[in-house]
From Swiss-Prot:
This is Transcription initiation factor IIA subunit 2. Belongs to the TFIIA subunit 2 family. TFIIA is a component of the transcription machinery of RNA polymerase II and plays an important role in transcriptional activation. TFIIA in a complex with tbp mediates transcriptional activity. Its main location: nucleus. GO terms for biological process: RNA polymerase II preinitiation complex assembly. GO terms for molecular function: RNA polymerase II general transcription initiation factor activity; TBP-class protein binding. SUPFAM superfamilies: Transcription factor IIA (TFIIA), alpha-helical domain, Transcription factor IIA (TFIIA), beta-barrel domain. It comes from the Eukaryota. It is found in: Nucleus; Cytoplasm. The lineage of its organism: Eukaryota, Fungi, Dikarya, Ascomycota, Taphrinomycotina. GO terms for cellular component: cytosol; nucleus; transcription factor TFIIA complex.
Length: 109
């Protein structure tokens, strides 16, 4: 089992990567095994980059509509959230937050 979650594959960049890999597979330019290696490296790179390079902070408020805990993964559905950055506020109708336990014991600091 992979030590990295596949969450970022559902982001816009992850979907674009998956579509491009599917095209390459259907054209016979790469094998499905190579595509899986690329996706694994994508999962690893996204996880490491977000853990090591992103240092921005924000606060948010909203109405908790739904929450679930299944297989060590929390999912929260927040309605009417308001995000406050340093000098900007952004709102939305609904967001989903997915929080996963780290699989790397050295990351528990």
């Amino acid at each position: 089992m992979s030590q990295y979650y596949e969450l970022y594959r559902r982001s816009s960049i992850g979907i674009s990567l998956t579509d491009a890999l599917d095209d390459l597979i259907s054209q016979g330019k790469i094998s499905p095994q190579l595509a899986m290696k690329v996706l694994f490296n994508f999962d690893k790179s996204m996880t490491e980059a977000l853990a090591e390079k992103v240092r921005s902070r924000l606060t948010f408020k909203g109405h908790l509509d739904t929450y679930r805990f299944c297989d060590e993964v929390w999912t929260f559905i927040i309605k009417n959230p308001s995000f406050r950055f340093d000098n900007e506020t952004v709102t939305s109708n609904k967001i989903r937050i997915v929080a996963c336990a780290t699989r790397d014991s050295s990351a528990n600091r």
